[in-house]
From Swiss-Prot:
GO biological process entries: dTDP-rhamnose biosynthetic process; polysaccharide biosynthetic process
Keywords: Carbohydrate metabolism, Isomerase, Plasmid
Family, per entry: Belongs to the dTDP-4-dehydrorhamnose 3,5-epimerase family.
GO cellular component: cytosol
A Pfam entry, by short name: dTDP_sugar_isom
InterPro entries: RmlC-like (IPR000888), RmlC-like_jellyroll (IPR014710), RmlC_Cupin_sf (IPR011051)
Top-rank taxon: Bacteria
Protein name per its UniProtKB record: dTDP-4-dehydrorhamnose 3,5-epimerase
NCBIfam families: rmlC (TIGR01221)
Amino acid sequence: MGGTELDEMYFQSLSIAEVKLIRPRKFGDCRGYFSEVFREKWFRKNVADVGLVQDNESLSAQIGTVRGLHFQLEPFAQGKLVRCTRGALFDVAVDVRVGSPTYGKWVSAELSQENGAQLWVPAGFAHGFMTLKADTVISYKVTAPYSAEHDRGLKWDDPAIGINWPKMTTYVLSEKDSSQPSLCELPVSFQYVKV
């Protein structure tokens, strides 16, 4: 885990090293708490040296709502810094970089209003989430603006990927997310470049 006791934020690489879990510190007293949730210089030094150009937010009213798995093609490929500002969600990143040693593998983290954790999902990964509470709000910063022409997706429950989604009695998906291609049907979108 990166960071020192003097830092306001800690981070750790998940089992796919490019995906990072960030935990901002909370400073509390009788009034509540204060937390610095983003500092560009710290982020560029410790997580990814990229610019974040747009903030997005979505509300999912029902528990078991699935959004994803989404990504965008170059030149509008998006890295995403994701946080949950109300409720809780199961957040997932899937490596779609052809040639990567972790191609088709996934990592996840639970993000919630309570834990304040954030997930960095770099370009070259499909991103999605499932709400664990009703009226969950997700907020995320992205490295490129939305482009409908470059918008792509991946089947959320593809058995070849095998995401261990939380069990729900029902899942709420859009028609678009219900009809995304599986990994084996996905055209080459990103090539892995070893650094």
